[in-house]
């Protein structure tokens, strides 16, 4: 029996859209680069509505260790691909250091300012 230990790093993508379409794009990307991810359905509740979507998880898997920068780069690429196929305008990536909000909208208005 073998135990492998690597530094912990987790990165999550949050994206609205059809989970089946997003899962298929994740399969394509994972097959292309050799990657293992998790996908969980989620519900976003926001001012004025709600929308179903996904939480996609990436980790530093000790069987195939990687750097945090590389994992984050893969998350950004995957998020962009999933956003496009799901016909969405934005995604969110959360890791221990940063939260990245990416939108292809030409407007972003915060109510109350």
Language-model regions, residue ranges each:
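Short secondary-structure junctions
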Residues: 30-37, 84-89
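Short glycine-/aliphatic-rich beta-strand segments at the starts of folded cytosolic domains
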Residues: 7-16, 55
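Short, intrinsically disordered low-complexity segments
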Residues: 35-72
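A structural detector for beta-sheet-dominated domains
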Residues: 14-16, 40, 59, 94-95
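Short, compact, well-ordered microdomains
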Residues: 65-108
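N-terminal intrinsically disordered, cationic/polar leader segments
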Residues: 2-6, 17-19, 24-33
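Short, low-order "capping/linker" segments at domain edges
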Residues: 51-55, 100-113
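A generic structural motif
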Residues: 15-19, 62-65
């Amino acid at each position: 029996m073998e135990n492998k230990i690597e530094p912990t790093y987790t990165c999550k993508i949050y994206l609205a859209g059809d989970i089946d379409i997003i899962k298929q794009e994740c399969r394509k990307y994972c097959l292309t680069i050799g990657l293992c991810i998790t996908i969980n359905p989620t519900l976003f509740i926001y001012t004025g509505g709600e929308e179903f979507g996904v939480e996609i998880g990436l980790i530093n898997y000790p069987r195939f260790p990687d750097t945090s920068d590389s994992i984050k780069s893969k998350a950004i690429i995957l998020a962009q691909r999933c956003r496009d196929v799901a016909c969405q305008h934005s995604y969110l990536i959360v890791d221990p250091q940063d939260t990245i909000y990416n939108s292809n909208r030409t407007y972003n208005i915060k109510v109350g300012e």
